[in-house]
Amino acid sequence: MASKLDFENQKYYIDFASDNGLEYLELEPPWYGDEDGAINRPKEYDITKPVPEIQLPALFDYARSKNVRMFLWTHWENVNRQADVAFPLFAKWGAAGVKIDFMNRDDQEMVKWYHMILKKAAEHHLMVFFHGAYKPTGTQRTYPHLLTQEGVLGNEQNKVTYLCTLEHTMTLPFTRMLVGPMDFTPGGFRNVTVEQFRPDMNQPMVLGTRCHQLAMFVVYESPLMMVCDDPAAYRNQPGLEFIKNVPSSWDETKVIEGKI
């Protein structure tokens, strides 16, 4: 969930994660620069220089004291330019890994780039998940620290479009999910009907029931599951205990029934 990135604000998120047994927190932009610039003008930014307001080394120390580890969001162009310096620094800070975004290609050059970056991340014991990514092709078999990747129209689209329909979410297990883990970001708790739904950047809604969103944690495959809503949406709500207790991976899945 994107939010104001200063030290006190992120402590709030770390505390929520710790209180609810969530192992990881992802720092989105603008941890190293303003959000618009980090996304649209990556060449102007340096992912080894966090903004002062976040007090990043101290934030890592605080997260560690709460048994929460952090992933750092990065634009792929910055990673391409700075991985040799940034990855050892991220490891020194204590980062669990990186979320790399906005590749938006699957040509041969980019596929080779994925492999190169995964090798570099492995050298520094950093886990990886790709956003703005192409569909999986079995790469996680060679690089098990690749946890998941997007390549799917997920819940974030509810902020700006009407595209994440119930029909779409019910079809994914039979289509996109067949090729590998997908970072759909389930767990929206502002559940509404088709008639009530509207795109909302600040308090995104999701179509369908609470149970529909919770079922995604079981049916959708992703060893790293995101909890997509904000703490205020979850507190004292039915379903939070399920999210706290459901595992993200298991040894065997038995399909009882399912068809399109």
Placement of each model-derived feature along the sequence:
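Catalytic domains of carbohydrate-active enzymes, especially glycoside hydrolases
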Residues: 8-30, 89-94
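Long hydrophobic segments that form regular secondary structure
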Residues: 194-214, 218-220, 225-226, 259
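Glycan-recognition and catalytic regions of carbohydrate-active enzymes
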Residues: 229-260
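Hydrophobic, well-ordered secondary-structure elements that form the walls
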Residues: 17, 128, 219
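Aromatic- and carboxylate-enriched substrate-binding clefts and catalytic-loop regions
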Residues: 29-205, 209
